[in-house]
Design a protein with these regions (language model features):
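Short alpha-helical
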Residues: 28, 50, 73-74, 146
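Alpha-helical elements of the RecA-like P-loop NTPase motor core of helicases
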Residues: 53, 76-77, 149, 185
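Short active-site oxyanion
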Residues: 40-42, 63-64, 102, 136-137
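PLP-dependent aminotransferase-like
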Residues: 57-114
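Active-site region of PLP-dependent enzymes
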Residues: 111, 121-191
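Conserved PLP-binding active-site segment in aminotransferase class I/II-type PLP enzymes
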Residues: 1-61, 82, 177-191
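Conserved SAM-binding loop
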Residues: 44, 67-68, 140
Length: 191
């Protein structure tokens, strides 16, 4: 059961976190996990599949994407929705695989310290059957600052959360793929 955000903030503040806005919780969670994974940046999303979708859209990749034939059903669907073609290959994998030929990695079942591959866009899942069991959620790890900035806006309907809504210029059309502060708080408390 998820606690209301108002009841979670005091728990986080007791642990030394400074919370001025509920979205600060998301930022804290992202920074903690970037450090754990060994990447410069982490961008939380609502699930791993949507994280990979955002990566393909950011890369503007429209070719053929090769993935293992024994992947989760949402992955080939996501590739098609991103404007690419799917090619399956019969290979065994464990924890992590590349969406070839892109630098995007599906690490839905892997979440280990120092796991980040430099130069990659590495996505993980926080489904209740995964290692960090938030219930729903995912993360994109990257060392690319431009990508990081784009992902943060694209995941939240094209909005820049650091700018008041009435002042935001909405320079891109985004998607509703963000992690809620409640999910991030659960992740901090479980991690």
């Amino acid at each position: 059961m998820f606690e209301p955000i108002e009841s979670v903030i005091p728990l986080l503040e007791k642990q030394g976190y400074k919370i001025n806005d509920p979205w600060d919780i998301v930022d804290i969670f992202e920074k903690k996990l970037a450090k754990f994974a060994g990447s410069k940046y982490a961008v939380s999303v609502d699930n791993c599949t949507d994280g990979m979708f955002l990566c393909l859209k950011y890369l503007n990749f429209e070719g053929e994407v090769t993935i293992p034939s024994n992947t989760w059903l949402s992955v080939p669907g996501m590739i098609i929705h991103a404007g690419c073609n799917v090619k399956f290959e019969d290979v065994e994998w464990s924890g992590l695989y590349q969406l070839k030929p892109t630098p995007v990695y599906d690490g839905a079942t892997r979440f280990t310290e120092g796991m980040y591959i430099p130069g990659a866009y590495q996505c993980v899942s926080f489904h209740h059957r995964k290692r960090l069991r938030i219930g729903k959620g995912g993360m994109i790890f990257t060392d690319d600052k431009e990508a990081y900035d784009w992902f943060r806006v694209a995941r939240y309907e094209g909005r820049n959360l650091s700018v008041p809504y009435e002042e935001d210029t909405h320079e891109i059309l985004g998607w509703n793929m963000y992690m809620t502060p409640e999910q991030a708080a659960r992740g901090i408390l479980l991690y």
